[in-house]
A protein has these predicted regions:
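Motif-centric detector for short Cys/His coordination patterns
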Residues: 1-89
Length: 89
């Protein structure tokens, strides 16, 4: 389940449960974490730096992450086929 507090990006999308479970299995805390992942989507699109915060996809790169911001997440999270965790904070 994603966090009850709203994400810093009001346009954020919820990360599917199977990928949240993978993050926890690979060492991310269940709550209060930020993870940087490399994600492959259906069709072969590669996102180098997907930022996940407490179960929410909040950004597609590290640019402009300070404070509250708006960045459009331009894909359906259900189309994720592979996740590689680069960093967990």
């Amino acid at each position: 389940m994603h966090s009850r507090t709203p994400p810093r990006n009001r346009l954020a999308k919820v990360l599917p449960d199977e990928w949240r479970k993978l993050l926890v299995a690979r060492g991310a805390p269940k709550r209060k974490y930020t993870a940087v992942c490399r994600v492959t989507l259906v069709g072969g699109r590669l996102i180098e730096e997907l930022i996940v915060e407490e179960g929410w996809i909040i950004a597609l790169d590290r640019a402009g992450l300070a404070g509250t911001f708006e960045q459009r997440i331009d894909f359906d999270p259900r189309t994720i086929t592979d996740v590689v965790i680069l960093q967990v904070v």
